[in-house]
Curated annotation (Swiss-Prot):
This is Nucleophosmin. The gene is npm1. The record marks D57, K82 as: Interaction between pentamers. Residues 125-134, 160-187 have a biased composition (Acidic residues). PANTHER family: NUCLEOPHOSMIN, NUCLEOPLASMIN.
Length: 299
């Protein structure tokens, strides 16, 4: 946790490139590249090593001295140049972490080394913007609190969950039938109100008086006619058949194979069967208890 918090608090780095160049010759064969800035990260990226126009036709060897991964001093040859054979070498971005010493090991020069000085500066402006974006509003914090507190874990046996799921499916079917009946009953008065509004919205005379509505009104329906319209056939609900003894045994066997345990006392076992499998048949319960005692798993 602490490492992740430290990584979040680190501001993003904004790289800056600066030109770098040095000259190595007979009277100055070494160039030391050191950085005293400890707050930012620095790197030296070497691009080319080339001979000057006045260089003699002899072998020029340029080496670099730095620190390896283990913190020990190491020397490597960067380029071997000769005016008549190879006057320049492209290093293609040879990056070295300072301190670095560039040295003309052989030859009189002049030799020119060019590249880039890379500095990674902290982008304070972007870090401030990110802090503002990550600050949660007080309204959101108040809304999150009750939601997290209202979550309470529940543990149930798998057999109880299966039985409850089957009961919920039956209840949902009954609720759907009731909702369909309610919607059909609600549609009837809506149609009546629409018809009365259309009757009242007849054209007015030029004098501003409404025409007689007696001829356009419908005759009221008798209670017998209303009863015929309201009474609609409903699909009969199929009663839920209780599970047989063999079906209950199969479910209990699956329950045991998953590492669970059945009650060992007859009274508790009977209550378990009644609650989980919704059966009141005493013969079925006695048959299941005999089967429970005959199990060889010892559970």
């Amino acid at each position: 946790m602490e490492d992740s918090m430290d990584m979040d608090n680190i501001a993003p780095l904004r790289p800056q490139n600066f030109l770098f160049g040095c000259e190595l010759k007979a009277d100055k064969k070494e160039y030391s590249f050191k950085v005293e800035d400890d707050e930012n990260e620095h790197q030296l990226s070497l691009r080319t090593v080339s001979l000057g126009a006045s260089a003699k036709d002899e072998l020029h060897v340029v080496e670099a001295e730095g620190i390896n991964y283990e913190g020990k001093t190491i020397k490597i040859a960067l380029a071997s140049l000769k005016p008549s054979v190879q006057p320049t070498v492209s290093l293609g971005g040879f990056e070295i972490t300072p301190p670095v010493i560039l040295r003309l090991k052989s030859g009189s020069g002049p030799v020119y080394v060019s590249g880039q000085h890379l500095v990674a500066l902290e982008d304070l402006e972007s870090s401030d913007d990110e802090d503002e974006e990550h600050e949660p509003s007080p309204k959101n914090a108040k809304r999150i609190a009750p939601d997290s507190a209202s979550k309470v874990p529940r543990k149930k046996t798998r057999l109880e969950e299966e039985e409850e799921d089957s009961d919920e499916d039956d209840d949902d079917d009954e609720d759907d039938d009731d909702e369909d009946d309610d919607e059909e009953e609600e549609e009837t008065p809506v149609k009546k109100t629409d018809s009365t509004k259309s009757k009242a919205a007849q054209k007015l005379n030029h004098n501003g008086k409404a025409s007689a509505l007696s001829t356009t009104q419908k005759t009221p329906k008798t209670p017998e006619q209303k009863g015929k319209q309201d009474t609609k056939p409903q699909t009969p609900k199929t009663p839920k058949t209780p599970l047989s003894s063999e079906e209950i045994k199969a479910k209990m066997q699956t329950y045991l194979e998953k590492g669970n345990v059945l009650p060992k006392v007859e009274v508790k076992f009977a209550n378990y069967v009644k609650n989980c499998f919704r059966t009141e048949n005493q013969k079925v319960i006695e048959d299941l208890w005999k089967w429970r005692q005959s199990l060889k798993d010892g559970k």
